[in-house]
Every structure is written in structure tokens, then in C-alpha cells.
């Protein structure tokens, strides 16, 4: 799939922690660019993907989205940040 001459989702795959499966899932819920992901934020993006793909989505994906936007590898994310993200995702 192409959008404005670019392969859709490729830009998302350039982010740390995100690969082709994550990119396809984000695209499926309408998030096709880094800018769209930044605007929506990791929690809302996670919730959309989790609603669309409940059996394929774990809390690790939430951490991956957060880390992707901050350029932080999953292994370097603090337990405090993870707890805050989980609380926000629960609403």
C-alpha cells in the first residue's frame, strides 16, 4: 500500500520497538504516520489496537508504543513508567 509515494507503515517501523506486525496493527486502526501516533499518544493507540486485536495485544505493546515515541528500548523503561501507563490504559 502506498500513500504519497511512501510505503504505508514503513515510517512507523523506523521507530524503536516497532516492527511490521505492530505497524500493520496501527494502520488497521487508522494510525499510519509517526505524527498521528504522537498526536494520539501511546495509551489511546494501545486501546484502539487492543480493541481491534484483543487476542494479539498485550501490555508489552503499550510499553513498546511509549518507548517508540521517546526512543527508549523496552528494557530501559522504568517500572514506575510501566505502572503509570497501565493505570492510564485502564482509565
Q: PLM features: what roles do these ranges have?
A:
Residues 21-29:
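Catalytic DNA-binding helix-loop module of base-excision-repair DNA glycosylases/AP lyases
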Residues 3-6, 46-74:
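Alpha-helical interaction/regulatory segments in DNA maintenance proteins
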Residues 78-91:
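Beta-strand-rich cores of mature extracytoplasmic or soluble domains
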Residues 2-16:
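Sterile Alpha Motif
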Residues 32, 50, 89-91:
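Eukaryotic low-complexity, proline/serine- and acidic-rich intrinsically disordered regions
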Residues 11-14, 25, 36, 61:
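Residue-level recognition of specific faces of alpha-helices
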Amino acid at each position: 500500500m502506498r500513500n504519497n509515494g511512501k510505503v504505508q507503515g514503513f515510517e512507523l517501523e523506523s521507530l524503536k520497538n516497532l516492527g511490521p506486525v505492530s505497524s500493520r496493527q496501527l494502520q488497521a486502526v487508522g494510525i499510519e504516520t509517526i505524527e498521528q501516533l504522537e498526536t494520539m499518544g501511546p495509551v489511546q493507540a494501545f486501546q484502539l489496537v487492543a480493541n481491534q486485536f484483543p487476542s494479539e495485544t498485550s501490555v508489552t505493546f503499550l510499553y513498546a508504543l511509549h518507548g517508540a515515541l521517546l526512543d527508549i528500548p523496552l528494557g530501559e523503561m522504568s517500572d514506575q513508567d510501566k505502572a503509570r501507563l497501565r493505570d492510564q490504559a485502564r482509565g
